Amino acid sequence: MTSSANRTLRAGVIGLGMMGRNHVRVWDEAVPGVELAAVADPDADAVERATQGRRARGFDDPERMFAEEELDLVSIVAPTSLHLPVALNALRAGVNVLVEKPIAATREEATQMIEAARDAGRMLTVGHIERFNPAIRELRRRLADGELGRVFQVHATRLGPFPARIRDVGVVVDLAPHDLDIMRYLIGSEPVRIFAETERRIHTEHEDLFNGMLKFENGVIGVLDINWLTPTKKRTLSVTGERGMYVADYIAQDLVFYANPEANDTWTNDGVTSVAEGEMTRRRIDRQEPLTVELAEFAAAVRNGDEPPVDPHDAMVALLLARKMVESAERGEVIAGDALAEVIR
């Protein structure tokens, strides 16, 4: 494959469900310097719809796509059970890979993918799309600047209706990796203790209601409230610290700061009491579609030889933490010590 420095990159998409169609649209319309060259899905109707009005070729088999098309990048938006074989085929063909989260079904599969990318000299990154939300990026910048002072708690809320399309996993593995990843991304610390409760109310096989808690090494408490039972979507993240609280709305791309005007270095009782009386400030956010930002940064990293936008090891940790949450709920026990440390290594 020729150098990518000064030429149009050729992208492919594997998996043409709802999210796959979004990848098709963004690659085709929104990322400069990239052309959508090929798509693949076993559903012939889905392939026909995706290629209609576009120059991209359609395939019913990813292996044939890799054999017949010279690609630089591919989005793998297939079911989780297919991530490993499809990613291995792509990497062997010399194609840089973005795989939607979760990275894989197991640690072993994720490790195989990471090692295959290293051996092939190609990039593997993972679609943890919330990292590319402008509200979260602005929040991270402000936390790094110390605007909240000491951070006490991070509370993630991710609620919505039951998605009939999900069959292979429950709500924890499907959704919790988003927030587990963002917590580590924002506070720069690792969990040392976790506990979770789950219930199955509607889903026929897996849990659809989840509440979890994490204690991080730096003392921050993480709280997760996630379900498939709420008739409207809610996606928020609040971060509470000694100088107030930030609330980010993922959907609205909104970031609001509630100041604690009495906060000071000694953190007096008066300071605590005044939290409810703080002023509200809405931070200015330049709104962008997170998927467009994500794919543009993936393409730029490939073109420039940079590090992956999301380290696949971080994605593996998010997956394994989610699975440990399920284990905690099943056992009714706190998980800590070596049993949790093995997830991070």
Which positions does each model-derived feature cover?
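N-terminal Rossmann-like dinucleotide-binding module
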Residues: 1-53
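C-terminal helix-rich "cap/oligomerization" subdomain common to oxidoreductases
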Residues: 1-8, 73-75, 297-345
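Active-site loop of classical SDR/Rossmann-like NAD(P)-dependent oxidoreductases
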Residues: 22, 42, 282-296, 310
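Contiguous beta-strand/loop segments that form the cofactor/metal-binding neighborhood of enzyme cores
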Residues: 180-260, 288-305, 323, 343-345
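Mid-domain beta-loop-alpha active-site segment that forms a flexible
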Residues: 127-134, 160-193, 207-208, 314-315
